[in-house]
Amino acid sequence: NGTGNILLQSAADIALQAVVKSGGGNISVIAAANVSQSADGDIETQGGTGTIDLEATGGSIDMTDGAVASAFGGSLRYKAASNIIIGEFNTVSTSNGDVSIVAGAHIIDNDTDVDVFSGGLLLSAGGTISAPVETAVERIAAQSGSGNIQIIEDDDVSIALLNVSVNRLGDNAQISSIISDSENGLTSNSNGSIVFQTKAGSGSISVDAPVTADSGGNILLQAQGTGKTLTLNKNTTTGSGNITLLADSHIVQNSTVSTSGGSVDVEAAASVSMTESGLTETKGGN
């Protein structure tokens, strides 16, 4: 109750099968192996600036369908050495709370519901981010180490620089350190492609941080909906892959769009405008 903190720590697995709740304090759940979270095992802070810090230091995190992590104004961080199968993350306050999901292997979404409701969302995977991940956020950044990034956003969104911090509790259940993650824009490695779309009729996209696909990775950015715009304020580049930029209304290009040998396809239902700082280059492609 109140602002009391909660620390759950195990030298093996942790199975969350009942609600873990703090009125306004911080929660740390730290397992040396795996963490599983059932639909009855919601984890939540109910007020103030309390954060949620959950980590499987030697294994995976498995959130079953219906499992929820929520912080009423604070931030959330889930980290695993291996895969993270995601459920629902909700910071309730879109202006303050951010979510960070960091997987040593893959970030996996097994349903078609919106997975993350927050101000900012940071995704980082040693493997892929896929299925796709459905979001309802204001700002987003993501990085894949060896595969594709697939994200569908439910509203207007900025691809941005994100820094997410949570409080790590020590053995006395007091804050012992601040854990922070940082990502800038959308980045795929090892020939991974990037697919970032808003749902039909739902949102504009503002590219306020670089979008970069390694080697032959392709890039698709698509803003869907009447009056929805794709605005390119930072560079969109791939090594030798293809770039497709689509908008149901306008595309505004204030930056470089570049590939070395691939093709660039830019289509807008209303208009495409390039400012003086806009440049499109294929370096031998189409």
Model-found features: residue ranges?
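Extracellular lectin-like interaction modules
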Residues: 1-286
